[in-house]
Amino acid sequence: MYSLIEAQLLGGKLVNRVMASLRRIIQRSLGYFCALNGILDFNTDIGTGNLRRYRVLFMYRLLHNFAVISLTLKFLFDFTDHFKYIESSTLITVNFFTYFTLVFFALLSSMGSCYQWQNRILAVLKELKHQRDLSRHMGYRVPRSKQNSIDYLLFALTVLLILRLSIHLATFTLSARMGFNHPCNCFLPECMIFSMNYLLFAILAEITRCWWSLQSGLKMVLLNRQLSTVAFNLWEIERLHTRFQCLIDLTSEVCSIFRYVTLAYMARNLWSGIVAGYLLVRFVIGNGLQDVELVYLVFSFITCIQPLMLSLLVNSMTSTTGSLVEVTRDILKISHKKSVNLERSIEWLSLQLTWQHTHVTIFGVFRINRSLAFRSASLILVHVLYMVQSDYISITN
């Protein structure tokens, strides 16, 4: 028995099984979290592909979304009642009104996308399940190293969710104990926005897995030169091209469905980066901060740092998705001299992929990748320097 356990550990089978079980548990739990936050009216268990509509979830989604919108508006209107505590601080006023505006926009974009494109989201998930079943039937497998990279991102996303819920609870408790009993606690809207971001992350991760399995099938066709005929290879390349094209179309469909969600995601990341960078400078300098202002700014910093942490995970996933076509074209460069027709078929497939992409875009203008992250960081740095310079001028005068 001990030798069997040792052999499994050495071969990595036990670790792979544990990772797969943990992945299924997390995917199912996050699917329940999405349903609990009124995102969709069907089960979003993407890992198992169990996609079923429930009338109870439909009614719950209506009631939940109405309650979230009502509470968010109440928080915003009640903020004016507490304005007397911070009316002397323009910084806090601008900060909180900007925060509420971005949260409200992200909330409306999430609800609007779910209401308007409910059937399209379900169709995308069903097609991904179909693609996954086809790959399993054909014997295509995702490389273990690549599968682990997505699993690690999923685990990090789960840790971030737990941290986010803990921070919200701790912030509310500390603010109540310190006497700042303002109703500006957007707990439910924040959870709903997080659920929508996870749904986008999960769909992109599933597209990436399906694409990686097709890449493994393409390598099998190009490298397995002895055990297959030319006619079979030509037929297999044609099938692979059809499925590659399907995944490219699904990526475009996802960008169309989530265009307002990704726009709100980008706007909030910019604001969070500016506020977090500015507060770091203010804390280091330590000039001109009142006690009330300091407490509010600390809470703002905690609120702003969470979207930035989430953006690292989503940006990593979108960067991986955007590079799928380029990696596939590199695989097609493998020489194959078995047949002239097969060589031409491979060249034709490469040409078909040349003018297409799997980039995640926002309204077709902004591309979510490392280049956008660099431009956003530059914009954040410029605004932070401008705000610090304005504070310095006001202090010296």
Swiss-Prot record:
Give one Pfam hit by family name.
7tm_7
Instruction: Give the matching InterPro entries.
Output: 7TM_chemorcpt
- Bilayer topology term: Multi-pass membrane protein
Under the GO molecular function aspect, what terms does this record hold? ligand-gated monoatomic ion channel activity; taste receptor activity
**Principal place of residence:** membrane
Keyword Transmembrane: yes or no? yes
Query: Which keywords describe this protein according to UniProt?
Result: Cell membrane, Membrane, Receptor, Transducer, Transmembrane, Transmembrane helix
Please give the start and end residues of each transmembrane region: 57-77, 91-111, 152-172, 187-207, 269-289, 294-314, 376-396
**Which segments does the topology annotation call Cytoplasmic?**
1-56, 112-151, 208-268, 315-375
**What does the UniProt entry say about where the protein is found?**
Cell membrane
Question: What GO terms in the biological process aspect are recorded for it?
Answer: monoatomic ion transmembrane transport; sensory perception of taste; signal transduction
**Gene Ontology CC entries for this record:** axon; dendrite; membrane; neuronal cell body; plasma membrane
Q: Kindly report every residue range on the membrane side named Extracellular.
A: 78-90, 173-186, 290-293, 397
Similarity comment text for this entry: Belongs to the insect chemoreceptor superfamily. Gustatory receptor (GR) family. Gr22e subfamily.
Q: Could you tell me what this protein does?
A: Probable gustatory receptor which mediates acceptance or avoidance behavior, depending on its substrates.
Q: What is this protein called?
A: Putative gustatory receptor 85a
> From which lineage does this chain's organism come?
Eukaryota, Metazoa, Ecdysozoa, Arthropoda, Hexapoda
Q: Which gene codes for it?
A: Gr85a
